[in-house]
Structure formats: structure tokens, C-alpha cells
């Protein structure tokens, strides 16, 4: 059990590495804004902390996109890495160090990790079946191949079931493989590869999950994966782009590079080391975070907090702790996994240009803190959050302008005009208690890993401030009871200072402006939480309004620009289709050349079923549990439709299911059959007429 923050041991906060293969949009930024806010909050508690990340320069997505543009992968990735370095600060995301996986530090650190695994016999070579494109005469690692997930039947990429059960897929597991290079069905060929023996860490991982702190989804999802027998992790790929496997004279390893999910998380360590070297180990010692061993054995956990998207929980709670343990490094203290960001109720679509790009927001002239507040407070951290210009306007005008800004401006303006600044009076017990309660809530939010609570803290205190000033009406007291008027305004100025301190993690730019308005010395970014109760300066100038109301015409223009861009992209798609004599259907897999016999088809027991009940599976992102009537009995089926259908409305729907499929267990829930659905949106197969449950599909 970890002690609460702050701790004497330094901490590190990391964010999942962005792939250096495309422009950033506001959906991507949720992880990094949240990580920045959490690191700032730790600092305000007096915690020594480094906030680090870096660009993921390797892997098949970058190799694929670089080849399409006719450039080498390194040049392609460096261009986006440099773009990210410029973009993050424009959203007040201030990394202590932002590196990349292809630099010298990470290359050597990664090889050091792998050599440790080799020396301790955690690496084994196996002959495995890998996807191969016969026409291109090359292997198809990871995203060079697509097909069907063997676990849930959804469309999947070569290394991940990204649209279904979220499982990591090993080379050779994907079914009905298709090359993304030529579009042809792939074949399988035998190749030697290196594996990390995850089975060596099975018992350790079970204990690790029990110790792990963070969000519930990161604590619960891994239990399914580690309760069964862990499969060894293939750590090499047949590619030219990446960090070479350190073969150490083993000829079979010389033409292999390391899997991207080996060197990517190791960048967390490398980036921390780079920061330590910049400031000096006397100020921040990276090994005190990652390698503070006792008698050569790492402790159960360092003060390491990973902030990621919920689609990479398995990598950070199963693979990564095993990798750390095998190399003698500390395990993470916490993993915080956030939901996705939707755009006005629907998913972002970069292919359709249906996105608000980071540059769009910057060019809009809107303050970055408005986005930070909207995305952090818009939902609980583990849930999906919606971004829209209309939603941003509503939350800004209601909460930041109407509540926070209104209290600050009316109270500080009254204080400056009537007293030249802070009135000469003591803070009342009522207000001191309210500020102390807000500080306690802030500390709790940090230690409970509730980023949303950090955003709510200053607004809730401002809500109290508005009620307090309205209740006492100091404008009436200046003549009738001047001493009481001074007391009320003194309290309000103290609340304003407390708001500046509490708001700094989520609204760093606006908090700095408020700090300056109060005439404070130094920077609010260096202030610790206790400063919320320290006396403000005696004098300050007339304040400016901290927040500007977002007018309808401004938001309408931003919406118009987005709609025009989407329409232009759609029109371009249609024009491209018209130019083809036989336009191919988008995103459809070719019909398999291999045919099955009619007898094989008859072996499938396909029936009409009626949905009796549908409910989400707790802790699973996409899975739902359905009770269905198949005529002869009621069955339970698990399907990846949680995010795609209104489960409450499915009761009574007639669907089509495969009834004689072997039973499977998904996320700890038994599934006895499979429903049939079409496309990425899982359109359910239904019947035109009212076929009774149990009717066989011929």
C-alpha cells in the first residue's frame, strides 16, 4: 500500500506516446492535458515530480504512411515529432522532457532492457507462422495485415483487435488475413522470432494487479488476461524500421527489429533520465524513481503514474510491468486510463476530415484553458467525453464566465475601488473552513486519481463565493456597517487567491493572470496548496475580466468551417468514385478464394433469436451481455456492441445468431453463441417478417 502524495520519493507522470504519423486533433489531446493537470496538482502538494513523454517513431503505421509519401520512415516521423513539440505548449501542456523513441538514449536503454531479459533466460526463440504477401514477397507485421479477431470475430489489425475485444494479437493469430499493401489474401510462412516469457511473471502480475492504483478500468480489465495462462509476447518483427534486436552473435536475430511495444514504454524511462541529466541528479534522480532497489531487488512500486487511453490498458498493466520486472526496474504505482473523445456526438474521422484539428483550435484565437476545462470536466475520466463548439460555448459561458469569472470580477473590483486592494481585516471562520474543505477535496482528487475533481474545485469554491457575497450584500454594508463590509470583501479576496491556487492545474494561463491581478510576487505555478490561505497583497490594481463570453456568431462561424470541410471531403470521395468505371466498395475485404462445401455450411446452426435483455459488462469498454430466446432455450451471448447500440431499446428485437458455436469466455463472462452483424457499426442482422425465435436460417 502506497503512502498518500506527497511522498519523499520523487515521482514521474507519463503520458502515452503519440504515434508520429499524423496531425493532432483535439481528441488526441485529452491524455496530455489530463497528464499536465495531474502533474501540476502533484507539484502543488509539494511532490517532486517530472512530467515526461515522447513521440513514438517506430512501428508499421509510420512505415506504411512513409512509404505512401515516398520518404524514409525517420524523416517522416521526425517531421511530426517536431510538430508535436510546437503544438503541446500552445495548449499549456508543459513537459519537463519530451523525447522520442529513436534517439540514442532510448535506443541504448531499450537494448539494455532486452539484454537483461536474455541474461536471465526470459527470452526464447520460436518458429512461428507469420502473414506473408506472396505478390510483394515480404512479411506482413502488425498493421501491414488486417483480418478477423480469433477471440471475438470482429475486424482487427495484425497486432490488436482495436474494434472488438481490445486484445493484443500475436503474429499468426489473425484469421482471414489480408495484405494492406496489395489487398490480396495473405498466406502464412514459418519464421524464427524472439519471445518474452510472460509466463515467468504470471504470479508476480497477479500480485501487481492487486497493488495497482489508478482508475477502475485499469485495475479491473487486466484480471481477465492474467487469470488464464499468459501467452509469451513476441518481441521482434520482420522490418527494417525500428531498433535492431541485440542479437549478441545469434545470427537468427540480426534481421529483426524490436516490436514497437517494446521500445515505446521504455521511452518513459529514457525521457525521465534525460530530464534528470538536464537538471542534475541532485535536483531530480531518475534512478530514485525507476531503480531504487534494496539488496538488488526492486521494491513493489515506484512513484510512477501512467496516464493513457483505455485502448492500451493491456500493454501498460500486463506487458509493461513484466518488462520492468524482468529488467530489475520498479513497477508503476498507478495507471489512469481515459475514455475517447467524440466530436459532436460521433467519432472523429480523420479520413473524412471530420475533426477539429489542434491547429483549428489555435487559429480560432480561443484561450487554451477553455479547451482544457471543457475536456477535463466534461465527463468522468474513464468515460467518453464529447467535444463540440456549442458545448465549449455553453460550459465556458455558464461555468467559467457566469460562475468563476463573475465572482472574481465583482469581488476584486469592489475591493480595489473601495479599499485599494485587500481590506484590513481577518478571514472569517466560515470562509477559512470553506477554503480548507476545498483544499481537502483537491488533495483527495489527486490521491483518488480523479482529474475531473481538479477542474471542479475552483468553480465550486467560486459558487460558494457568489452565494456568500450575495448573502451579505457588502454594497449595502459600506455605509450601514463598514467593518462588516471590510470583513466580507476581505473574505472574498481570500477566496479569489484560493481559486488562483486551485485553478492552476487545469487553468494555468488564467490562474497566472489572476495571480498577477492580485499583485502577488513570483509565479502561481510555483505556489503550493497552502498558499490558498496566505494573505494576499494589501494593494492591487483594478482587475480585468478574466473570461470573455463566447458569442453565438463566433461559434456559428467555427461550426460553418467544420461543416464545409466535411462536405468538401465527402464530395471529393464521391468524385473519386465517379471516376472509376467500377468503383470498389469502401473498406470491404475481398471475397476469399477458398470456398467451403455446402455440407460445411449446413454444419452451422443459424437461428432467429429474440433479445430478452441487454446490459453492459462492467469494466469492459465495448462488450455487452445479451439474454436471447432461441426457441428451445434462453442463451447468454456476449457481443462488442456496447458503444454502438442503445442496449435498452434492443429488448424484443429479432436478430440472427450462430447457435452451435463453442462456448467462450469474454471478460470473465460466458458466451454461448454469436450474433451476426455487419460493418464497423455492427448493424444487426434481422428478419424482414416476424420469424419466430428458433427458426433456422437456411
Curated annotation (Swiss-Prot):
Zn(2+) binds at residues 149, 152, 161, 165. Keywords: Aminoacyl-tRNA synthetase, ATP-binding, Cytoplasm, Ligase, Metal-binding, Nucleotide-binding, Protein biosynthesis, RNA-binding, tRNA-binding, Zinc. Binds 1 zinc ion per subunit. One of its GO terms (biological process) is methionyl-tRNA aminoacylation. Its cofactor is Zn(2+). Pfam families: Anticodon_3 (PF19303), tRNA-synt_1g (PF09334), tRNA_bind (PF01588). PANTHER family: METHIONINE--TRNA LIGASE, METHIONINE--TRNA LIGASE, CYTOPLASMIC. This is Methionine--tRNA ligase. It comes from Natronomonas pharaonis (strain ATCC 35678 / DSM 2160 / CIP 103997 / JCM 8858 / NBRC 14720 / NCIMB 2260 / Gabara).
Amino acid at each position: 500500500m502506497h503512502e498518500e502524495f506527497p511522498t519523499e520519493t520523487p515521482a514521474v507522470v507519463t503520458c502515452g506516446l503519440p504515434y508520429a504519423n499524423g496531425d493532432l486533433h483535439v481528441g488526441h489531446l485529452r491524455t496530455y492535458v489530463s497528464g499536465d493537470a495531474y502533474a501540476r496538482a502533484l507539484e502543488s502538494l509539494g511532490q517532486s515530480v517530472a512530467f515526461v513523454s515522447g513521440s513514438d517513431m517506430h512501428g508499421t503505421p509510420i512505415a506504411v504512411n512513409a512509404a505512401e509519401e515516398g520518404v524514409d520512415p525517420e524523416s517522416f516521423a521526425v517531421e511530426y515529432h517536431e510538430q508535436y513539440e510546437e503544438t503541446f505548449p500552445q495548449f499549456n501542456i508543459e513537459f519537463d522532457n519530451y523525447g522520442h523513441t529513436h534517439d540514442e538514449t532510448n535506443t541504448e536503454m531499450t537494448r539494455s532492457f532486452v539484454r537483461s531479459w536474455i541474461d536471465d533466460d526470459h527470452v526464447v526463440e520460436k518458429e512461428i507462422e507469420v502473414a506473408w504477401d506472396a505478390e510483394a514477397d515480404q512479411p506482413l507485421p502488425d498493421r501491414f495485415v488486417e483480418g478477423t479477431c480469433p477471440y471475438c470475430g470482429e475486424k482487427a489489425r495484425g497486432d490488436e483487435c482495436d474494434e472488438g475485444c481490445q486484445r493484443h494479437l500475436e503474429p499468426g493469430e489473425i484469421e482471414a488475413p489480408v495484405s494492406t499493401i496489395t489487398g490480396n489474401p495473405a498466406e502464412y510462412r514459418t519464421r524464427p522470432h524472439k519471445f518474452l516469457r510472460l509466463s515467468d511473471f504470471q504470479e508476480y502480475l497477479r500480485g501487481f494487479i492487486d497493488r495497482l492504483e489508478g482508475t477502475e478500468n485499469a485495475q479491473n480489465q487486466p484480471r481477465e488476461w492474467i487469470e488464464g495462462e499468459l501467452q509469451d509476447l513476441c518481441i521482434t518483427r520482420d522490418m527494417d524500421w525500428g531498433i535492431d534486436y541485440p542479437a549478441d552473435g545469434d545470427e537468427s536475430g540480426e534481421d529483426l527489429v524490436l516490436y514497437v511495444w517494446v521500445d515505446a514504454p521504455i521511452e518513459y524511462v529514457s525521457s525521465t533520465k534525460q530530464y534528470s541529466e538536464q537538471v542534475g541528479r541532485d535536483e531530480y534522480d531518475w534512478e530514485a524513481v525507476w531503480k531504487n532497489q534494496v539488496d538488488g531487488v526492486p521494491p513493489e512500486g515506484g512513484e510512477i503514474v501512467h496516464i493513457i487511453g483505455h485502448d492500451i490498458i493491456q500493454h501498460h498493466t500486463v506487458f509493461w510491468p513484466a518488462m520492468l520486472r524482468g529488467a530489475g526496474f520498479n513497477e508503476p504505482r498507478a495507471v489512469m486510463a481515459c475514455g475517447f473523445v467524440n466530436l459532436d456526438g460521433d467519432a472523429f474521422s480523420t479520413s473524412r476530415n471530420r475533426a477539429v484539428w489542434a491547429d483549428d483550435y489555435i487559429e480560432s484565437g480561443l484561450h487554451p484553458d477553455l479547451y482544457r476545462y471543457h475536456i477535463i470536466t466534461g465527463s468522468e475520466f474513464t468515460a467518453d467525453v464529447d467535444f463540440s463548439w456549442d458545448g465549449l460555448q455553453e460550459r465556458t459561458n455558464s461555468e467559467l464566465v457566469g460562475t468563476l469569472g463573475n465572482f472574481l470580477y465583482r469581488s476584486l473590483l469592489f475591493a480595489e475601488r473601495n479599499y485599494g486592494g485587500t481590506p484590513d481585516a481577518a478571514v472569517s471562520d466560515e470562509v477559512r473552513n470553506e477554503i480548507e474543505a476545498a483544499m481537502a477535496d483537491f488533495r483527495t482528487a489527486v490521491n483518488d486519481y480523479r482529474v475531473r475533481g481538479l477542474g471542479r474545485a475552483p468553480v465550486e469554491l467560486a459558487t460558494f463565493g457568489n452565494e456568500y457575497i450575495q448573502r451579505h450584500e457588502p454594497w449595502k454594508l459600506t455605509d450601514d456597517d463598514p467593518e462588516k463590509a471590510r470583513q466580507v470583501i476581505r473574505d472574498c479576496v481570500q477566496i479569489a487567491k484560493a481559486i488562483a491556487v486551485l485553478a492552476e492545474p487545469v487553468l494555468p494561463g488564467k490562474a497566472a493572470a489572476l495571480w498577477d491581478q492580485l499583485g502577488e510576487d513570483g509565479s502561481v505555478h510555483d505556489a503550493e496548496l497552502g498558499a490558498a490561505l496566505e494573505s494576499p497583497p494589501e494593494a492591487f490594481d483594478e482587475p480585468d475580466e478574466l473570461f470573455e463570453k463566447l458569442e453565438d456568431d463566433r461559434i456559428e462561424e467555427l461550426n460553418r468551417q467544420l461543416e464545409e470541410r466535411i462536405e468538401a471531403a465527402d464530395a471529393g470521395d464521391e468524385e473519386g468514385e465517379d471516376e472509376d468505371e467500377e468503383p470498389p466498395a469502401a473498406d470491404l475485404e475481398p471475397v476469399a478464394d477458398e470456398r467451403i462445401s455446402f455440407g460445411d455450411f449446413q454444419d452451422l446452426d443459424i437461428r432467429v433469436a429474440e433479445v430478452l435483455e441487454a446490459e453492459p459488462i462492467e469494466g469492459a469498454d465495448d462488450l455487452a451481455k445479451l439474454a436471447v430466446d432461441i426457441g428451445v432455450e434462453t442463451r447468454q451471448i456476449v457481443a462488442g456492441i456496447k458503444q454502438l447500440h442503445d442496449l435498452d431499446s434492443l429488448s424484443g428485437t429479432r436478430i440472427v445468431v450462430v447457435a452451435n458455436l463453442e462456448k467462450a469466455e469474454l471478460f470473465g463472462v460466458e458466451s454461448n453463441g454469436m450474433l451476426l452483424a455487419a460493418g464497423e457499426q455492427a448493424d444487426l442482422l434481422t428478419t424482414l417478417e416476424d420469424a419466430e425465435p428458433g427458426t433456422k436460417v437456411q
